[in-house]
Structures are given as C-alpha cells and as structure tokens.
Amino acid sequence: MQFFENDSYLRSALRKSVKRTPIWIMRQSGRYLKEYQSIKKQAKDFLSLCKTPDLSSKAALIPIKKFSLDAAIIFSDILILPYAMGMDVNFYENLGPSFLNPISSISDMKNLNVPDPEKNLKYVLDSIKIICKELDKKIPLIGFSGSPWTLACYMIEGKCNKIFSKIKKMIYQNSKELHFLLKKITNSIILYLNSQIIYGVNAIIIFDTWGGILTEEKYCEYSLHYMSLIIKNLFCKYKGNKIPVTIFTKNGGQWIKKIAKSGCDVIALDWSVDIEYARKQVNGKIAIQGNMDPFELYGSFSSIEEETNKILSKFGYNSGHIFSLGHGIYKDTPPENVNFLIESVHNLSKKYHKKNRFKK
C-alpha cells in the first residue's frame, strides 16, 4: 500500500477500511473556478494549456489548494492522445473539440503513429512530476485516458454529435478496419498509461464516455474488450504498490456485472444508476464511484446535504465507496456549493465506517 498522509481514496478503491468516504470530482479543475480562468488566460488556447507543464500542473493543483479533496487528477484531455498519434485537433470554446481531418480510410488508420510518451507526450509526464512534487505525498494523484472506443468515436466522426453514425456504420460495414484502429489506439493507451504510472500517478481511470451508445453485444466487443486488454497490460503493481484502475462507462449501468469482470478495481457510475443496485451487482468485490447528478450542485445547501446523505445511505456501511459526481462538473457551478458537498461527504460518511468488515 502506498503511503500518503491521506490515503482514503486508494484504500477505498481497494476496499480497505477508511474513517470516512473519500471524494474527488470529475473536472474538479475547470471553468467554475476563477483561479482556473486566470491560469487559462496565460495560455494561447486550451491545447497550449495542456502542453505547458508549468500551467497544467498549476491547474491540477487549484482545487486541491481550495478544497479538502481526497485525490488530485492530472490536468489534460482525453484527445491529447489522438493528437500525439498525428491528428490535428482544435478545442473551441463552448463548441468542444474538432478534428480537422477525421479518419475516413484504412490508409488514414495506418498513417497514425503509436506515440512514444517520452517524446510525444513528455509535457504530460513533466506535469505529473511537478504535481507529485507539490503534493508531497499528501494525497494520491490520478492519471487517465479515454477508452479506445471513445477516442475512435471522435477520431472518425471529427467532433461530438451524440450519435456517432460514421463509426456505428463501420461496425456493420468495415468491422475489420475498425478493429485495426481500436487495436492501435489500445496499444497507444497502454504505453501512455504505463508512462503515467512510471512518472508518479497512483491510480488510473479509463473514461468510456460513449460506450453507452452501443448495444450490449457491441459494447462487449468494441469497448469493454479493449479496456480489459489495457488493464491486463498495465503496471497494476508498480514498485510493490497496487495501482487501482477505474472504468467509467457513461450510460453503462446495465452492464455492471460485465464491467466487473474486466479486471478493474472500481466501477464509476453516472447519476442514472441506483448505487444500492450497483453495489449488489458486484457483491462487494469491486469498489463503486459515484454518483451525484452534477445539477444537484445548483441547489441549496440543505438539498445538497439531503442528496449526499441519500447516496451514502444507499451505498451503506463499510468501505469500497468513492463519492463523486456522475459526470463532469458544470462551468457555472457555485464553488461554495462544491465546498459544502465535500464537507458534507466527509462529515456524514463517518457513521458508515465505524464497524468496517474489510481488512485494515
């Protein structure tokens, strides 16, 4: 077990005893914080922010200095990897990412690089080094990547459109070519995440944002299969320390039992899933992350406290729960409500850990 002043995130991910439920928030460093906006202005654009270690590390540390969070997460974007593979991507304010030349043929796929993280993604690794030094073993650092399926959705479609008709047509018209692309992305992710681990991250999350648009059969073949391959090839134990892995498939609550067989340590839920149901599905063998609706943070303190207590009570007693939102925090969320949520989770969860049946 890795040593930190506050190791509750790692302990919960591994279903070990804790004194209170840990919390971190998806996009915890983001536009809702004026401090983030200030740092963002120092970069030419979002991509430049991600590629400047001094700035990206500062961005990652903003919420850690502002709130009593139990884990930090690197500041980057899932589409940094396709960019390193040779694709041109732009991030437009309020419109999202866009690829200038989306993949449209097998030759496009063959022309993609499998990037060497030490060369093509060094700015991410350098940011990790800076963050780890600043954290000074106070709390763990989370690294991440998008899932192969989710990255392929953007790379083929060119932008987010919620339907992703081009890649879904490929399933039925050019499945061999699609699997070729997914394998190349998978190999790139394995190298990327293992480099993150070498440089100091203590846990990994795979964000499968668009896995939920598939049928169960296609999800298992085109998304879950490749995430399982990633997990099997990660340095899940590095320098004697277990590196817990989380899978987050948005709108994938119906596949919890299948995800639990992937080799992951934690399943992250969106807000559409009942957390009590999810815990029963994994039978205490996998930790659960989640799963407050981000819109709850627009409510009053009393309503936030009520919903927090509801989620904690539904999960119930003992460890294995990491509190978080069911997706990323919204840009106009009141920071004082975020602080209240964190304090509420810490205070209200203590009673659920007094008699812990898991190993210490």
From Swiss-Prot:
**Per UniProt, what is one Pfam family of this protein?**
URO-D
Known EC number(s)?
Answer: 4.1.1.37
Q: Which GO terms describe its molecular function?
A: uroporphyrinogen decarboxylase activity
Give, as in the UniProt entry, the pathway in which the protein acts: Porphyrin-containing compound metabolism; protoporphyrin-IX biosynthesis; coproporphyrinogen-III from 5-aminolevulinate: step 4/4
PROSITE patterns named in the record: UROD_1, UROD_2
Q: Could you say which residues bind substrate here?
A: R27, Q28, S29, G30, R31, F46, D77, Y154, T209, H327
Q: Where is this site: Transition state stabilizer?
A: D77
Q: Which top-rank group of organisms is this from?
A: Bacteria
Any one of the GO BP annotations: protoporphyrinogen IX biosynthetic process from glutamate
UniProt cross-references to CDD domains, sorted A to Z: URO-D
InterPro entries, per this entry? UROD/MetE-like_sf (IPR038071), Uroporphyrinogen_deCO2ase_HemE (IPR006361), Uroporphyrinogen_deCOase (IPR000257)
Would you tell me the Gene Ontology cellular component terms? Answer: cytosol
Q: Where in the cell is it found?
A: Cytoplasm
Q: List the disulfide bonds.
A: none
Query: Sorted alphabetically, which keywords does the UniProt record give?
Result: Cytoplasm, Decarboxylase, Lyase, Porphyrin biosynthesis
Would I find Cell membrane among this entry's keywords? no
> Which chemical reaction does it catalyze?
uroporphyrinogen III + 4 H(+) = coproporphyrinogen III + 4 CO2
Keyword presence, Lipid biosynthesis: no
What family classification does the UniProt entry report for this protein?
Answer: Belongs to the uroporphyrinogen decarboxylase family.
* Task performed by this protein: Catalyzes the decarboxylation of four acetate groups of uroporphyrinogen-III to yield coproporphyrinogen-III.
Q: How does it assemble?
A: Homodimer.
Listed HAMAP family: URO_D
- Protein name in the entry: Uroporphyrinogen decarboxylase
Question: What organism does the record attribute this protein to?
Answer: Wigglesworthia glossinidia brevipalpis
In the UniProt record, the gene name given for this protein reads hemE
